[in-house]
Regions:
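Segments that shape or occlude catalytic/ligand-binding pockets
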Residues: 52-97
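Short acidic, Pro/Gly- and aromatic-enriched capping/linker segments at domain boundaries
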Residues: 98-113
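Glycine-rich nucleotide phosphate-binding loop and flanking beta-alpha elements
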Residues: 93, 101-103, 315, 375
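Active-site loop segments of alpha/beta catalytic cores
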Residues: 2, 7, 15-60, 65-69, ...
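Generic hydrophobic, aliphatic-rich segments that mediate packing or membrane embedding
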Residues: 78-85, 110, 114, 162-169
């Protein structure tokens, strides 16, 4: 491989490839499509790469850790992982995120219902073993007109309580640790937030019969996102290596809208947003979309996205073919099957899954290993540990898998 040039936020340095790299060096090396000492791992470095609360609490019990669990996202019930857990897993990434507003918070209507800061109502939905998620119960813009958008009580993107003290915290983390940092400004969704506020069926109908409303709503969300993201990146942009954004654009079988519709409506919005982001930070752009988005990857690259997550293998299929087709232009982040192997497979099955994804996606860098989306409550602790241990076992460069 030879010596590698390491770039982080515009600063270059060289290091000997025979030495063990720091997590930050390791991640940035694969983002440069070069081979580090080993494949980096992300578990807990973001809102789509963590563990759902019940599964996380079982993992902590298995590890003998009794700390209080902190919730990252109420709807998806994702946990902030303790530092001790992340060190045991060997995660190379840490999250730098905006804080909850001190002026505006979700409102509990009763023990089973709440409204979020956008005015969307959610209702508790139980499933096995007493676990629950929150299902969309009411969309506040379901019957709105374009004129109504101007009168709607939007969250205030200039609310600086969301970043109070964040610059100092991010600098301390950057200077005193060697992890790769993923920035998440909190407001970063367009399509998902739009249809959540409008209702999915109505929004899909609007794509055909009411483009004026769709355009007006997306423009409003762009305005809010830019206004909120600016202060966040002013605070942390120099310290992060990755900036996370995303929208679920597909199901397991195909896109939620035609590629033409995406290119006409959403792509220009994202281009404006990401142009703004890149004016504030040198961090690489991480884009999360579940489902089969193969037909849009070229479009994502065109607007500056260089990281694709979660690499939903149950939808995308042959990961070796994905690497051949897109691997020179994007870094794949995720890829370990959360839908079938992690919940239902044995430790040996998990190890085989990790080995396969590293074999397919790891050559020449461009791969950060991790689960496909958040690890769910039905994944046994031994399989989470098997995932982490297998990445270290099989991920050493030069790869031999």
């Amino acid at each position: 491989m030879g010596a590698v040039t390491f770039w982080s936020a515009g600063r270059g340095a060289r290091f000997d490839d025979m030495a063990e790299m720091t997590p930050r060096e390791r991640v940035v090396t694969v983002l440069n499509h070069q081979e580090p000492d080993r494949v980096p791992l992300d578990i807990g470095g973001g809102g789509a790469t963590s563990i759902v609360v019940e599964g996380y609490e079982r993992l902590k019990r298995a590890l003998g850790i009794s700390s209080e669990t902190r919730m990252m996202n109420k709807v998806f019930r994702v946990a902030f992982l303790d530092e001790s857990v992340m060190q045991r897993l060997g995660s190379d990434c840490r999250l730098v995120t905006a804080k909850p507003s001190s002026r505006l918070a979700p409102k509990d209507l009763d023990e089973n219902t709440f409204t979020d800061v956008w005015g969307v109502m959610w209702r508790k939905a139980y499933y096995g073993d007493g676990c629950h998620y929150w299902d969309l119960a009411k969309s506040p813009l379901a019957e709105a007109t374009v004129e109504d958008l101007d009168r709607y009580p939007w969250p205030d993107p200039s609310d600086l309580s969301r970043i109070k003290g964040l610059a100092e915290e991010a600098k301390a983390l950057h200077d005193n640790t060697n992890y790769a940092f993923v920035g998440d400004g909190g407001f970063k969704s367009f399509w998902e937030l739009a249809w959540t506020m409008r209702g999915l069926e109505q929004m899909l109908t609007d794509l055909v019969v009411n483009l004026e409303f769709v355009t007006a709503l997306l423009d409003k969300l762009l305005e809010i996102n830019i206004a909120a993201t600016g202060p966040f990146l002013d605070a942390v942009g120099r310290y992060i290596q990755v900036f996370r954004t995303g929208d679920d654009l597909a199901t397991q079988t195909g896109l939620l809208m035609s590629a033409k519709t995406y290119r006409t409506l959403l792509k220009p919005v994202y281009k404006k947003y990401l142009d703004f982001v890149r004016s504030k930070t040198d961090a690489r752009i991480f884009y999360h979309s579940c489902g089969n988005i193969t037909d849009l990857v070229d479009d994502l690259v065109e607007i500056g996205i260089t990281i694709v997550n979660p690499v939903q293998v149950s939808a995308l299929g042959d990961t070796a073919a994905l690497k051949v087709r897109f691997g020179q232009r994007v870094t794949f982040w995720g890829g370990i099957d959360t839908q079938h192997v992690l919940p239902h497979g044995s430790v040996a099955d998990v190890e085989a899954e990790v080995r396969q994804r590293i074999s397919d996606l790891g050559p020449s860098g461009g791969y950060v290993a991790g689960a496909v989306h958040n690890i769910q409550p039905d994944v046994p602790p031994e399989n989470i540990l098997a995932l982490a241990d297998a990445v270290r076992k099989y991920g050493t460069y030069p790869l031999t898998v």
